[in-house]
Amino acid sequence: MFPSDLGLIDANGLIQALNQMGGIGDFNDRDLARFQKALTSTSGYTGYNLEKTVKRFLPAYTVLCNRVARDNAPVGLMAGPQAHYKAQLGYSGFDFGAAMGTAFGANGSDGNPSATDIGPDYKSQSIHGSVQLEAIDFARQFDDPLQQQSLFNLTALMRIEELLVAGGNEFIISTPAPTGSGAGTGTTFHSGTWTVKVTALTEEGTLRNQTGAYVPVVGKAAGETVPGTASIVLGSNQLYLDVKWPVIKGALGYKIYCSAAYSDSTDVYLLDPATELAYKDGGTIHTSFAGQKYVGVNHVRIIAPPAGTQGVPTLDGSANANQFEGYWAWCTKTTMYGVDLSGAGQRVFTDMDGAAFTSEDGGLVEINDALQKLALLYHTAPTAMVGSPQTIRAITNKIVHNNNVSMMLVGNQGGNLQQQNKFIGGIMVGGYTNTFAQHYGMSPLIDIIAHPYIPDGNLMLLSETLPPDTYRNANDGRCFALDVLRPYNYFPLASVDRNVNFDMWFLETLKCMYPTAQAAIAGIRVE
């Protein structure tokens, strides 16, 4: 049985099926009438959109996803896990199989196909649930367990979906480019050859869909590359290893691995940023969460050999298969569109090399540079800046320290003398002024959003809409949209058992129509 509207129970059909059930013991007419009343008239589940209820508990997902336009998927049988989409892709040389994570994605002719048929069954998340019929007792003022179980399932699904939209996969990157060792008077590192490897924490999807080192190996999941290994030859009495590597387009953060003993090129183990790593100038690395093993910078010191025994991820693709893009991927590269936009004059991207933001009289140098390039190259202006809470805190501290924010004095509010002439402690920088957006329909104020799932040291500048000047003689356009398959329920009702089993699945796919309007700053030192 399928509901007539996504996210809603077909109460009449459910009751009709229950009335036709036989052999269910002492489930008498009085119980059935009470069950029917609960479902059809007063239950919070019937006729209620569970998606909105669940999103109240997922603030980060709500803030980001509710800002962009929504394209609702078709209803009915085609809305299930086997739903198919016709995707228009206007670029040639696109590796459909690699991008979609399935061999069946390569439908269509070679060259520049007008469309491809995508069966995104691997993107659907589903949760199985069950409730006991006798537990549904509206007369005693209990919550409908069918509603509660469904809300629980949907919450789990949307937490999965939020991670898929905002990040959560780890891929191995190519060889880092270490600069060697910093001299010291201590004896932390024995003379000899030390091995260092680096992995990248990325969004779901490939690192870059282009020729070169980032092309997926045949037969393996999209996004995998050969692990990067750097050998550092040291003299005696070295205090630390100085290691740097280029910012990996699409990476959110990095994990650093090192050999536990000199001249061991085989066994490398994960380093703890709190005790075994430092910033490039020796400063202590402070992570947002205790036990966080990744860093947001691409230039560090290794100040101690690894004490743990966690090795480098495997290459078999078992943990990375069939993943797809998220917000950050569109800011640093474009995989779904099959074109490398990381070259000069194409991608607005800043590699901080482990440095902190730089202050100037008009704000922060790196942010202003990115805003200027977006206005100059693409005639657009971001409407949102998204980073980790620690990254937003670093922006706030820099702006306040440079006196680029105004203090607010609380006056006499409603005659309350206790509230008169008091300063409010603490500063929240909830927006940033775009100096280059005074006209053409651009937004001069950029909303700042702290997203808990983005690792430290990364800042996205999202253009959610295009001003009329970008395409002259046109209205405002949109850069992002959500293909939405709202919660969908399936109830294979029991004919004998009182236990009702059901499944629920949920799907949202983010689309970016204008990837060049997005900018990113990576490798920022935040404290």
Question: Positions of the model-derived regions?
Answer:
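Disordered, low-complexity "stalk" and linker segments at domain junctions of extracellular
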Residues: 167-336
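Assembly/oligomerization interface modules of large self-assembling protein complexes
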Residues: 37-128
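Acidic Ser/Thr/Pro-rich low-complexity disordered segments
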Residues: 95-116, 205-221, 263-279, 407-417, ...
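Stable alpha-helical elements in mature extracytoplasmic
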Residues: 146-149, 157
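Extended amphipathic alpha-helical segments with heptad-repeat/coiled-coil character used for oligomerization
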Residues: 168, 379, 383-384
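Sequence/fold signature of self-assembling virion shell proteins
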Residues: 2-42, 47-51, 55, 136-137, ...
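Sec-exported extracytoplasmic/periplasmic mature domains
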Residues: 154-162, 166
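Solvent-exposed, polar/charged alpha-helical surfaces in well-ordered, non-transmembrane soluble domains
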Residues: 151, 155, 369-372
